[in-house]
Regions:
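N-terminal amphipathic alpha-helix/helix-capping segment at the start of soluble metabolic enzymes
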Residues: 1-20, 95
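Catalytic domains of carbohydrate-active enzymes, especially glycoside hydrolases
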Residues: 36-55, 125-126
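Glycine-rich, proline-tolerant flexible connector loops at the mouths of alpha/beta enzymes
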Residues: 47-89
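Glycine-rich anion/phosphate-binding loops
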Residues: 27-43, 91-93
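Hydrophobic faces of well-ordered beta-strands that scaffold small-molecule active sites
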Residues: 19-21, 49-51, 109-112
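Active-site beta->alpha loop and helix N-cap motifs at the rims of alpha/beta catalytic domains
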Residues: 74-126
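Conserved, mostly hydrophobic/aromatic
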Residues: 22, 41, 122
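Active-site beta-loop-alpha junctions enriched in small/polar residues
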Residues: 24-26, 52-56, 114-116
Length: 126
């Protein structure tokens, strides 16, 4: 396995485990909740917190066609995919405050972008 460096830490064979706390859609549309998740992850000893950067429009079409509605047999039955992705997407204007809290807590922050616009946004954020 290749050894890589993430935020000054070596990651690879023979290196200590690099623990990543995944926030993704667990924010529930609540910025204070995200900030608390970052603080708790840092206090628990995680090395990094990972977000997901996307918009509903970059994930699916905003249509009512049957193939874009969740089928029976799961908790989201009858829900439109676009609505679910809109709820799961983290507002981009939250990122500066999340980054500031992560920096103050000494935990690395990064995100998985899902489309070119998200990549551009994250590059702009530093």
């Amino acid at each position: 396995m290749t050894t890589i460096e993430i935020a000054g830490r070596l990651v690879g064979t023979g290196q200590p485990t690099f623990v990543i706390a995944e926030v993704s859609a667990n924010h529930g549309g609540d910025l204070p909740r995200v900030l608390e998740m970052v603080r708790v992850a840092a206090a628990a000893g995680a090395d990094a917190v990972k977000l997901q950067t996307f918009t509903a429009d970059s994930m699916t079409l905003d249509v009512d066609l049957p193939r874009f509605v969740v089928g029976a047999g799961n908790p989201w039955s009858g829900r439109r995919l676009h609505d679910l992705y809109r709820e799961a997407a983290m507002p981009w204007d939250w990122y500066p405050e999340i980054a500031a809290v992560a920096a103050s807590e000494g935990i690395t922050l990064f995100s998985s972008p899902f489309d070119p616009a998200s990549v551009d946004f994250l590059v702009e954020q530093g």
